[in-house]
Amino acid sequence: MSFVAYEELIKEGDTAILSLGHGAMVAVRVQRGAQTQTRHGVLRHSVDLIGRPFGSKVTCGRGGWVYVLHPTPELWTLNLPHRTQILYSTDIALITMMLELRPGSVVCESGTGSGSVSHAIIRTIAPTGHLHTVEFHQQRAEKAREEFQEHRVGRWVTVRTQDVCRSGFGVSHVADAVFLDIPSPWEAVGHAWDALKVEGGRFCSFSPCIEQVQRTCQALAARGFSELSTLEVLPQVYNVRTVSLPPPDLGTGTDGPAGSDTSPFRSGTPMKEAVGHTGYLTFATKTPG
C-alpha cells in the first residue's frame, strides 16, 4: 500500500480507512493478530483484512459491516491524528494548483505539522519530484518521518528539524515552489527566495489573520517577488430539489378561478450552514533576473 500508487490487496503494515457509514471513518494500521473495535463489532485484522481487496465490504462481530478503503491524501486528512491545526482538501487543492505542482516538482514546506499538506504534495509530485519539509518541533518532526515511512512515501520526502525563520530549508536554488504555514511567514521570505531556483518559482503562505497577510506581502514586495495575490476559499453547498408551483398569471383577462395545474422544476438553494473562514492564501512569483 502506498499513498502514491493504488494496490489491490491489503497487506500487513498497510494503513486502511474503515468507512463506518454516515461519514464516520477511522484509520487503522493493519497488523497480523490485531483487532479493531468498531460500533459494528470487532474487526480481526488477520481474518477480515489481510489478503482482501481494498474496497471490500467486511462483516464485523455484531453483524454490522464496514467498507475498507484504500488510503488517499484526502481520506488521510479527514482521519489523521491531529498534532496541530491542519489544512483541508479545499485549501490544499487551490495550493497545489496555484503552485503549479506536477510530477517532478521540487517543493520546500514549513511547518510539517500533522502532515496533511505534505501527503497531498507528495502524491502530486511523485514519482520524480521531492519534498523538503521543515518542522521546528522535534517530536512532531519524528512522528511525521515515521508516518511517511509507514505510508511508503519516504523516498519522496526529506524531513528536517530546525527553525525555518532562522535556518531556512537546508537547500538552496532547488525548489520549484515554497509553501509556508507558520505564525510569521514574513520572517522566512528571504529563505524562501534562496530555496527557489535561480530561474524562478512560486510561493504560497497560509495565514489565518489579515495582519499576517499584510506583513507577508510587504516582505515579499521588498524581497523582489511579483504577481502578489491573496485568496480566501469559502465553498457554498447547494441543496437541489424539485419544486412545484402553479403557472404564473400572465394577465390573459379570462374570468373564473385559476387552474389547479402545477409546473414542477428543479431548484438550487444555498444551505443555511456554510463553511466559515479558515485562512488566507497568499501567492507570489519569483522571476529570474
Curated annotation (Swiss-Prot):
Compositionally biased tracts (Low complexity): 250-259
Ligand binding (substrate): 20-22, 35-42, 64-65, 85-89, 110-117, 180-183, 205-212, 278
Region called Disordered, residue ranges: 245-272
Binding site for S-adenosyl-L-methionine: L87, S114, G115, S116, E135, R140, D163, V164, D181
Keywords on record: Acetylation, Methyltransferase, Nucleus, Phosphoprotein, S-adenosyl-L-methionine, Transferase, tRNA processing
Reactions performed catalytically: adenosine(58) in tRNA + S-adenosyl-L-methionine = N(1)-methyladenosine(58) in tRNA + S-adenosyl-L-homocysteine + H(+); an adenosine in mRNA + S-adenosyl-L-methionine = an N(1)-methyladenosine in mRNA + S-adenosyl-L-homocysteine + H(+)
E.C. number: 2.1.1.220, 2.1.1.-
GO cellular component terms attached to this protein's record: nucleoplasm; nucleus; tRNA (m1A) methyltransferase complex
SUPFAM superfamilies: S-adenosyl-L-methionine-dependent methyltransferases (SSF53335)
Residues modified as N-acetylserine: S2
Chief subcellular location: nucleus
Enzyme class: transferase
Pfam families xref list: GCD14 (PF08704)
Subcellular location: Nucleus
Residues in coiled coil: none
Single GO term (MF): tRNA (adenine(58)-N1)-methyltransferase activity
InterPro entries tied to this protein: SAM-dependent_MTases_sf (IPR029063), TRM61_C (IPR049470), tRNA_MeTrfase_Gcd14 (IPR014816)
GO biological process: mRNA processing; tRNA methylation
Modified residues (Phosphoserine): S263
Assembly and interaction partners: Heterotetramer; composed of two copies of TRMT6 and two copies of TRMT61A.
Record function comment: Catalytic subunit of tRNA (adenine-N(1)-)-methyltransferase, which catalyzes the formation of N(1)-methyladenine at position 58 (m1A58) in initiator methionyl-tRNA. Catalytic subunit of mRNA N(1)-methyltransferase complex, which mediates methylation of adenosine residues at the N(1) position of a small subset of mRNAs: N(1) methylation takes place in tRNA T-loop-like structures of mRNAs and is only present at low stoichiometries.
Family under the similarity heading: Belongs to the class I-like SAM-binding methyltransferase superfamily. TRM61 family.
Protein name: tRNA (adenine(58)-N(1))-methyltransferase catalytic subunit TRMT61A
Recorded name of the encoding gene: TRMT61A
